[in-house]
Amino acid sequence: VSHLELVCSPAVLAAVVRGLVPLTLLGLGGLVCQRAGVFNVALEGLMLTGCFGAVAASAWSGSAVVGVAAAAAAGALVAFALAAGSIRRRADPLVLGTALNIAVAGTTTFLLQALFHVRGTYQRPDLARLPHWFAGNTLPWIGPALAALSPLGLLAVAAAPALHGFLEHTVPGMRLRGVGADPTAAASLGVRPDRYRFAALLVAGVLGGLAGAELSLGSVALFTENMSAGRGWVIVLVLLLSGGRLPALLLALLVYAYAQAVGFRLQTVGLPMQLSDAAPYLATLAVLIHTGLRARRRGLAP
């Protein structure tokens, strides 16, 4: 393998797609919360819940569709708990979100042993996984990337511009942004901030669950303890540094997925694992700092 193929090849592009899809779904859910003025640190738990729910339901039913539906429902259930506690009961969202992350990690580990009688990883050869409609295409360069797209990947591609259109060009979207910018002013105009924030958290729950389903049933068909592996915290950091700007969010996630894909391949030529593991975070941080500075110069930063 040449040095160029390690950093730029169809295989790298396919790996980027596989890594980017769950990040995008989870990131869009987090963005909805952020624009509604909700600091959602439970994204890690939402994704992990989706991972387990998808595999458990797929194993029980033999259907990936049922697995995806269960993942979305499980994510929505965790988000409902967060919304009920932080919005209805006025609990600290940071404390409650962190507690939910810990609870989900412990619960999925317990259920893995209780339901499947295994520790660490559950994997079965006949476990239904998501279809890949473009598998087998012979297109040069982009062929492997298209083959890596599942239906949830196509959903992620469509969801990003759809969310932009909703937030910028619809009345409910503008009201949601108004709630995030100044809830008191929004309430004076007859908008109910709690209702929009509750809905934003539920949307994040569904998208987080779908992100987990993509992670566990997309390119693989398995569940392992703590499968989300910090991706939710990566999204939280990216959202904080991107200032709620969708282009900056997507660019940062793309850089993260690319650096992660290249890092894995560079391990095969002797790059220390610690360096390859750190590369996605360092690259993403550099991009966010650069875009943040540019935005401030242009007066676009919030």
Give residue ranges: language-model regions.
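Single transmembrane alpha-helix segments in multi-pass membrane proteins
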Residues: 11-61, 66-68, 72-98, 240-245
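Cytosolic-side transmembrane-helix boundaries in multi-pass membrane proteins
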Residues: 162-163, 181-195, 263-302
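Helix-loop-helix "hairpin" substructures at the membrane interface of multi-pass membrane proteins
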Residues: 144-223, 246-251
